A protein has these predicted regions:
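N-terminal secretory signal peptides that target proteins for export/translocation
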Residues: 1-4
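Bacterial N-terminal signal peptides
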Residues: 9-20
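Boundary at the C-terminal end of the N-terminal hydrophobic targeting segment
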Residues: 20-26
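Charged, alpha-helix-forming regions
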Residues: 30-31
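Vicinal oxygen chelate
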Residues: 35-45, 73-80, 85-89, 99-200, ...
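Amphipathic alpha-helical segments
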Residues: 45-60, 129-131, 200-211
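Glycine/small-residue-rich interface belts in oligomeric ring/scaffold proteins
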Residues: 48-103
């Protein structure tokens, strides 16, 4: 009985310590990284995208699932407790969609870090705030996909087809009661920093500031997101 009681006490103590550590780590996380739900790494072929990330980071992304009717599928690698890297590409198992696939996948020649997605628990408030700041995020839409284990994830998000500042301005997502995808994504990588470049940095920065996002934009020859990530292969910059 004493041994069993001690075992329960130790288990509870470890659980409390784990929660405390997670809270402490979250408190140390820069504000921008706390806002990031996921980064979108678009690829013309999902297997190519998965192998590219594995070579760069040393982490092999786990299968995410299909996006029914959109002609796409994804794979995921966690970047933190509630953030992840989404590798998304065409799904050959689905019929070709009536319109173009999202994120310009049909024209994409090689994998690239295309855009990012911000967390929100009140999408309507975000859209209203954005509109007041002169930023049109588009409509709030429903989304869903089925994981390989059969669990269906549902979410709401602002229109991902709305392109602002060449995709440096994110769309926003609310997972509601669905489990966060990072919970079942491949582990081993950590997002350290996200920054951006643009030929007209002031224009992009104005929109990001209107949304209260801390992403900094510097002058560059083309629009680009640059993520600094720590992984088994060391620190890398992903573009």
């Amino acid at each position: 009985m004493i041994r069993r009681t001690l075992s329960v006490v130790v288990t509870v103590s470890l659980a409390v310590a784990s929660i405390a550590l997670t809270v402490a780590q979250s408190a140390k996380t820069p504000p921008l990284l706390q806002r990031i739900d996921h980064l979108v790494y678009a690829t013309p072929d999902l297997d190519l995208g998965i192998s590219t990330i594995e070579k760069r980071l040393g982490v092999r992304a786990t299968a995410g699932g299909q996006h029914p009717g959109l002609g796409t599928r994804n794979a995921l690698a966690a970047l933190g407790p509630t953030s992840y890297l989404e590798i998304i590409g065409p799904d050959p198992a689905q019929p070709k969609p009536a319109g173009p696939r999202r994120f310009g996948l049909d024209e994409l020649k090689s994998p690239r870090l295309l855009t990012w997605v911000a967390k929100s628990a009140d999408l309507d408030a975000v859209v209203t705030k954005a509109k007041a700041g002169g930023v049109a995020l588009g409509a709030v839409l429903p989304g869903s996909r089925k994981r390989p284990d059969g669990v269906v994830l549902s979410w709401r998000y602002t229109d991902p087809n709305t392109v602002l500042a060449d995709r440096l301005v994110p769309f926003f997502i609310d997972w509601g009661n669905s489990p966060h995808p990072s919970a079942t994504a491949a582990r081993g990588a950590t997002l350290v920093e996200l920054r951006a470049e643009h030929p007209e940095p002031e224009r992009a920065q104005k929109m990001l500031d209107a949304l209260g996002l801390g992403l900094r934009v510097s002058q560059g020859p083309a629009a680009a997101l640059i993520a600094t990530i720590d992984g088994p292969r060391g620190r890398v910059e992903l573009r």
